[in-house]
């Protein structure tokens, strides 16, 4: 028997191994006799009747509409959307059968599946869409695009579609059933994304408003779409999304281990399918074939290339600021190991400075959604989020999305509060207007002064190649704090250094240490920074280094929000590299010059003027075990 209700439809997904818990599938809550038209401030949501016992979050009230049935067992509709590319892009654009009009199906097409609510005749609805490379992708082992993804799609269908939203899933070029090349966020992919947005906004059943949401790669496609400034794109919700590809893989010139291989190795098999036949040949695009060369050259030159087109094509934020007129809701984890938080901070302030309505939700999780207690627990370690669990779990998140999309896509209801919601590493949530905050107090610690040198490395205060291999450090410590010291944002470490060669790199590791215990055993990570000295001025400008000349390395830590408890102190340790970063391509020993010009700069939070709040309390079994 065909499913004839939304709950039954979602239950049917379990039979085809959609990855979602049975408790979530079976959860049905009757609508409360409560007026939820008035927005409840975030600091009062813990008084609302959220179900906090499940593996996902839910809206407070089920919507009135069911899922519109189709002849597909998942009640979806699948279409292929044509779009134009210049022949210079290669792939499908240069396929002779396309160029000579022998077979239009060989021309560039984007694969799209959508679901609609069963609404009264004539009622038009907005569309929430997720765009990425993972739908029906053979190499990733993911379900067909006509099935809602268990990572997000099922939750959207259950919680948001009944409130009058359509939902769509879209495969980027060269993945799933979309032909052409896997372009890794390049021009071809961007054009296909824009074509999908335009198509969704112009259907007769659409009200013309489109919102994009997704995590990781799927959180980067919203930024790509926003570059075009399409009138139909009203809001984006990037979750751990990229503002640029090079920005993902290089920080201050230092290269992540995956950087030289990202395009061809990590995503190299995407787009190839046993069912595509000769369409597999369409992956022969210039950027795809040359991407390893670009990445290798960029590694040699610390993220810089003399031919910049590959990377500038894949940087989004500048064009978003120039063209986009919608809103942005950023979701980011402070401990995201995949997409570092510098994608969100200071991006959020940049958006606000350009008049874009924006908010950010930043908790102490890693590469995850904010409402997944089981994943968050499994992926949290000491100094990497566990001290903020289970307070990090946001069971009000789906309600937050409903209120956001209702205003920006349905154009009704009160405007959501554009609070920046920030969680520190001990679990405290607070509201900020900007982040980093503008009312912070700068506190400086001079290396060799109130940041005391307590341990030299094997060569004194010289950072040298190979320190990581022998676990050697240069260690500094502050005095013990006599109060709870809260700081956050983007701490800075400005070091006077003298490279003994034409390059070199420095890695800084910051810890919270108890005064009454061994920091090596009891200290926890609070943050880190990395720099290739060819970028010692900070930013993206390549610098030439003269061996023996003293320079200032203007290092910036990844975003952090930290509470150092009373009776604890800060330890700062230096060596050549750390985390998952590669050694510099021109390694050299670097002497750290102590004195007033070498400074750790922290931004103390003015906590007395902040609103702190507790989110709905997690009662799911993983939380209760804490």
Report the location of each language-model feature.
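Short beta-strand/loop motif that positions the catalytic acidic residue
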Residues: 324, 330-332, 336
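Cap/lid segment of the alpha/beta-hydrolase catalytic domain
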Residues: 121-201, 373-388, 514-515, 579
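Secretory targeting signatures
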Residues: 1-33
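A catalytic-pocket lid/entrance helix-loop region that shapes and gates access to the active site
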Residues: 188, 213-283, 352-403
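Glycine/threonine-rich phosphate-binding loop and adjacent beta-strand/alpha-helix elements that clamp
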Residues: 32-66, 75-84, 93-97, 397, ...
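Accessory cap/linker subdomain of secreted extracellular hydrolases
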Residues: 36-71, 82-83, 91, 137, ...
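A short loop-to-beta-strand scaffold at the N-terminal edge of the catalytic core in hydrolase folds
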Residues: 87-98, 105-118, 127
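Alpha/beta-hydrolase fold nucleophile elbow
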Residues: 204-216
